[in-house]
């Protein structure tokens, strides 16, 4: 009998109502806002309300430098969380949110795989509660305000050839990597070369993941540097009066999302900064809540140990104040063979490569 696909397994799963999942980790109803039957947002007041509860053991899952296909950190994280529950330990897992670009690319979704998945499958990998779209909108709001500032006379003296803030989109669109904006009539803006990055690479996404409160996020957004003046001085979002607008757009996005695994293990899924251009870890607020919800909080550091794990220890943990108790390193023969320089890992993994 052939092995069912990940999607078939996910669709055959029996899920708990999200209110029951929240109850399992001690979240009262007033701290949980359902988004349908199987997803919810957690109010940030939970950080204070749960603070007096015992602290869970904090476990980080990382990996050797992965191949383009990924080596299974998420699958291992989910499987470990489910296994803890099988031996009578109350475990919660904490993961980054999926980016739609890689979901439709060679790497695929971010739900795990096989019988170690976070569900609902489609919601997790596409849109979820709209956090990605909120980050996209906030980022592009700042881009629009920057271009409008240039059009309105450039009072700050911004050097048009030294602007570092581009636009973002949660789609792998090669044709938008480098573009020229402001073409057309004079009222259509100042022509200049810019481009699009993917939303997960946005500094606004990194800010979302590192913020400890709404006020902290407001301050961090205001400190974003968008470019430099002709005198070489940095120009910030605060100087463009964009920090408040960005915060309002992202006000719901800062609340962590609650889902579950195939075996009903609670999963906090929040924020998705990349590990190559940012710190590659799920949100600080998600872990500040999750650390008081059971015996173990198991989180994943994105990319390889030299990227996500290094930044987990040196950036995320310093912001959250949480210290890990153990680390799990995922290692595959496929990755080791790929790094030997003798094998090129592509879409199909033929038998001799695995």
Give residue ranges: language-model regions.
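Flexible phosphate-sensing "switch/lid" loops adjacent to ATP/NTP-binding sites
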Residues: 1-353
């Amino acid at each position: 009998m052939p092995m069912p696909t990940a999607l078939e397994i996910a669709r055959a799963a029996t899920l708990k109502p999200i209110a029951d999942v929240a109850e399992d980790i001690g979240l009262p109803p007033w701290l949980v806002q359902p988004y349908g039957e199987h997803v919810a947002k957690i109010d940030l007041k939970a950080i204070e309300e749960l603070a007096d509860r015992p602290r869970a053991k904090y476990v980080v899952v990382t990996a050797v430098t992965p191949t383009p296909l990924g080596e299974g950190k998420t699958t291992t994280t989910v499987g470990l969380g489910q296994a803890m529950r099988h031996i009578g330990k109350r475990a919660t897992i904490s993961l980054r949110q999926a980016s739609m670009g890689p979901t439709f690319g060679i790497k695929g979704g971010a739900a795990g795989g096989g019988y170690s998945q976070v569900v609902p499958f489609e919601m997790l990998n596409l849109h979820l509660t709209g956090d990605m779209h909120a980050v996209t909108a906030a980022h592009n709001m700042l881009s629009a305000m920057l271009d409008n500032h240039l059009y309105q006379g450039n009072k700050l003296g911004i050097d048009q050839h030294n602007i570092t803030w581009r636009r973002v989109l949660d789609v792998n669109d090669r044709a938008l990597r480098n573009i020229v904006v402001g073409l057309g009539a004079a009222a259509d803006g100042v022509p200049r070369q810019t481009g699009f990055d993917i939303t997960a690479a946005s500094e606004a996404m990194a800010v979302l993941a590192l913020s400890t409160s709404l006020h902290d996020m407001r301050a961090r957004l205001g400190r974003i540097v968008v470019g430099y003046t002709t005198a070489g001085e940095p120009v910030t979002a605060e100087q463009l009066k964009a920090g408040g607008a960005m915060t309002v757009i992202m006000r719901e996005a800062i609340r962590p999302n609650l889902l579950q695994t195939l075996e009903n293990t609670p999963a906090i899924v929040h924020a998705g900064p990349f590990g190559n251009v940012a710190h590659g870890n799920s949100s600080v607020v998600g872990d500040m809540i999750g650390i008081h919800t059971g015996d173990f909080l198991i989180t994943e550091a994105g990319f390889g140990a030299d990227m996500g794990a290094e930044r987990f220890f040196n950036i995320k943990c310093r912001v959250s104040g949480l210290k890990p108790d153990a680390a799990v390193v995922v290692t595959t023969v496929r990755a080791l063979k790929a790094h030997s320089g003798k094998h090129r890992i592509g879409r199909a993994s033929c038998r001799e490569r695995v």
